[in-house]
């Protein structure tokens, strides 16, 4: 993937 939006609980792929 290009990028990832990450928090303490989860990482959501952002493509």
Swiss-Prot record:
A GO molecular-function descriptor: toxin activity
Instruction: Give the Cysteine amide positions (modified residues).
Output: 15
| Localisation | Secreted
Name the predominant localization.
secreted
Annotated S-S bridges: 1-15, 2-11, 6-14
Q: Give TM segment ranges.
A: none
Q: GO CC terms for this protein?
A: extracellular region
Q: Is Secreted one of the keywords UniProt gives this record?
A: yes
- Residues of the signal peptide: none
Question: What is the top-level taxon of the source organism?
Answer: Eukaryota
Give the UniProt keywords, A-Z.
Answer: Amidation, Disulfide bond, Secreted, Toxin
Annotated tissue distribution? Expressed by the venom duct.
Question: What the record says about its domains?
Answer: The cysteine framework is III (CC-C-C-CC).
**What protein family does this chain belong to?**
Belongs to the conotoxin M superfamily.
Which protein is depicted? Conotoxin reg3g
State the organism named in the record: Conus regius (Crown cone)
């Amino acid at each position: 993937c290009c990028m990832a939006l990450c928090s303490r609980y989860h990482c959501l792929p952002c493509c």
